[in-house]
Structures are given as structure tokens and as C-alpha cells.
Design a protein with these regions (language model features):
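Histidine-centered, transition-metal-coordinating active-site segments
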Residues: 1-136
């Protein structure tokens, strides 16, 4: 059956949830923040997705490497992420983890690698990366 609360605590939990929705989730300021976060995440995702080479997934690493001058943090860190979690870099044997992306044979696997990379970011780091995308 799962966890059950007494009527008293169930009512208290409902009041807290109602407050959260009224004061936080449905607040206009939170909507602006939610839109900002969506922009940050989409911008990072789209920038990295442009580096995928459909004809030759191995070339994707070269494409990431070419981005290092414009986006040193983003390119450097994502390059390392791909290197650690895939089989497409020759010297990755020193990393004993499972190579969850294999040879990154498809665009979908590459997209998942990007999603996993972004999901591991702190809010502060994601904003730093986003600011790097804005610099000329």
C-alpha cells in the first residue's frame, strides 16, 4: 500500500503543496526563471548537437575539438565526457567505467550523451557555459 498519513498530516501536506503551487510554481517570477533555464539548456544542447557527424561519428570528436577556441570550457569538458563514456577515443582504456555510449553509432546516442552531460551540471556551471556561448 505504501506510506499512509493520518488525516491530520495528510491535511497538513496538502496545505504545504497548495502553498508551494501558489507561492512558487505558479508565480510569475518563477515562469521567467523557467523560461531562462529552458533557454540555457536548449542553447547548450543545440551547440553540442551541431558537432555530431552523421557520416562518421569519430569525426564528432574532431568537431568538438575545433570548438575549443570559441568555447574552451564547454568543448573541453564535453570532449572528456565523450572520451570517458564511449569507445571512440583510443586511450580510454585507462577509464575503467562502462562505455555506455559504445561507438556513438547514432544521432540518438549522441543526443543522450549530451543530455547526460547537461544533467550532471550544477545550475551555476550551466550558466557559466551559457555565458561562454554569448562571448565573442
Amino acid at each position: 500500500q505504501g506510506i499512509r498519513l493520518s488525516d491530520k498530516y495528510n491535511k497538513m501536506l496538502k496545505e504545504i503543496k497548495d502553498f508551494n503551487y501558489t507561492a512558487i510554481y505558479n508565480n510569475e517570477k518563477f515562469k521567467v526563471y523557467r523560461d531562462y533555464v529552458a533557454l540555457v539548456i536548449r542553447s547548450i544542447f543545440n551547440t553540442l548537437m551541431k558537432t555530431y557527424d552523421v557520416c562518421n561519428p569519430y569525426k564528432s570528436l574532431d568537431n568538438i575539438d575545433c570548438m575549443k577556441e570559441a568555447y574552451p570550457m564547454l568543448a573541453g569538458d564535453f570532449y572528456k565526457h565523450i572520451k570517458v563514456y564511449s569507445n571512440i577515443q583510443g586511450d580510454n582504456e585507462k577509464y575503467k567505467n562502462k562505455k555506455i555510449y559504445g561507438n556513438i553509432e547514432t544521432k540518438e546516442i549522441y543526443a543522450q550523451a549530451i543530455i547526460d552531460y547537461i544533467s550532471g551540471m550544477t545550475d551555476r556551471y550551466a550558466v557559466e557555459i551559457f555565458n561562454e556561448l554569448l562571448k565573442y
